[in-house]
Structure formats: structure tokens, C-alpha cells
Amino acid sequence: QNSYWECQELLEDILDSYQRDFPKYSERDADLKYVQLVFARTPHIVGQPFKFVAISRDIQSKYIRRGIELCHQAGVIHPVYSSHGFPLEAKFNPDRYKLLFADLGLMQRACGLNISRWISEDYRVIHQGTIAEQFVGQQILCNHYGFKSGKLYYWERQKRGSQAELDFVIDGQDAPIPI
């Protein structure tokens, strides 16, 4: 039990360390505010198609976009772009994406998710899709499976009455490979 709480404290220290480092990635004081906001909100929206209002309803999208760019440069978030064809890079939509957080452990800590409760059926049902998507995306990024551009992709169909999504697709030799 002690090691669990020590681990949670360590994760909290890492999150705090990121916050202290953000001024290094912010060219202006105004940027710092947006970087901090994006960093704080991203763990709560992992795996969801990104909407600027998920970060803030009161801040213009151009400022949030700048915060996303800076967080991505800092390596604390990673966009997963929608792509509708092959090759993925040629058919992706730079304005349609989801976000991954830096790390699954950090994500659960930032969200206040208690790992020891994951064995509870109700708790798992609520969070398992997000947790799985973060884990798989993180593994793809760590191992550089099937991508050269540094971009991750997903596929979705948004037709009325016929919605579908593949959380990740990578370039294969002759066709995209769903993950």
C-alpha cells in the first residue's frame, strides 16, 4: 500500500516538474497561460475528437492552438490526426484530431483516477476506452510502429446513422493497417 502512494506522489512531482518547465517553451508570458491550460485539460479529453471548447469556452481558438503546438513541441501531448485514405500522410486532415497525453500514469494522476479502483467493474466501464487508447497510442509512439512522419492517424466515418472509428491506423506496404 505504501509503494502505491509513493508512486502517486512521484507522478504528482513529475506533473509539477512539467509545470515548472513550461516557461522554457513559452516565448511570451501569454503563451504560458495557454500551455498550462492545454496541459491541465488534455488528460480529461484523451481519445475524443478535439473541440476547442473542451479546453475553454472563453479563449479564442488561435490561442488554444498555440498552446497545443507548444505542448506538442515539449513532448507532453501528441495529436492523432484523422485520415481518410492511403497513404495516410497525403489524406490526413490537419484540423481534425484527437490528443494523447505524455504518459498513461501521468494521465491517470492528472485526472485523479485511482489505479487501485480499476478493479471495480463500474469504474472500468467508465474509463477503459480512454485508458486503452492512451496505452496503445503511447506504445505506438514509443516503438515507432509503422510511421515515418512522426504523425499518428485514426480513421472515422461520420455519416448519419453510420458512424465508425478505428482508434489508430498505420501505413502498411499496400494499405493502411488498423490497430
List each model region and its residues:
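Conserved beta3 VAIK motif of the Hanks protein kinase fold
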Residues: 179
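Accessory nucleic acid-recognition modules appended to NTPase machines
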Residues: 3-175
